[in-house]
């Protein structure tokens, strides 16, 4: 039964992987364009923030973005293969030493800054 489920997930990933997904990790600043449905109209909303965690789990892969707007911390969990995700763009590559940046949740202002990575050639897709 698990092999059947695994094959189904792989088929769905192939169908949904027509959009280009860049290589990124925690600490990178991302710009995600998502489709938003307002009643009968549809528009694209852009969310830009720091990736605080990435979860690679096949079809259920996701990542969490965090940004500070008007002194409020906003977190958005985005599923990688969601049909509402229009595009993902890496704005900045961050230099961090952790895979999950949960310590960032309590930081604001200058203490929440992340250094920029200089060797981005090996991480570019």
Swiss-Prot record:
Cellular component GO terms, alphabetical: cytosolic large ribosomal subunit
Membrane-spanning intervals of the chain: none
GO terms of biological process kind: translation
Entry's Gene Ontology molecular function annotations: structural constituent of ribosome
InterPro entries per UniProt: Ribosomal_bL19, Ribosomal_bL19_sf, Translation_prot_SH3-like_sf
Residue ranges of coiled coil: none
Pfam families reported for this sequence: Ribosomal_L19
Keywords of the record: Ribonucleoprotein, Ribosomal protein
Disulphide connectivity of cysteines: none
HAMAP family xrefs: Ribosomal_bL19
Family membership: Belongs to the bacterial ribosomal protein bL19 family.
NCBIfam families the record matches: rplS_bact (TIGR01024)
Role this protein plays: This protein is located at the 30S-50S ribosomal subunit interface and may play a role in the structure and function of the aminoacyl-tRNA binding site.
Full protein name: Large ribosomal subunit protein bL19
């Amino acid at each position: 039964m698990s092999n059947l489920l695994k094959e189904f997930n792989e088929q769905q990933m192939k169908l949904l992987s027509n959009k280009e997904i860049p290589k990124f990790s925690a600490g990178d600043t991302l710009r995600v364009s998502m489709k938003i449905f307002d009643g009968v109209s549809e528009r694209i909303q852009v969310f830009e923030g720091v990736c605080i965690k990435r979860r690679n789990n096949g079809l259920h892969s996701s990542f969490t973005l965090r940004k500070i707007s008007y002194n409020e911390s906003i977190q958005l969990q985005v599923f990688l293969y969601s049909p509402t995700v229009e595009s993902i763009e890496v704005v900045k590559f961050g230099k961090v030493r952790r895979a999950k940046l949960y310590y960032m949740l309590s930081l604001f202002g200058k203490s929440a800054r992340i250094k920029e990575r200089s060797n981005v050639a090996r991480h570019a897709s």
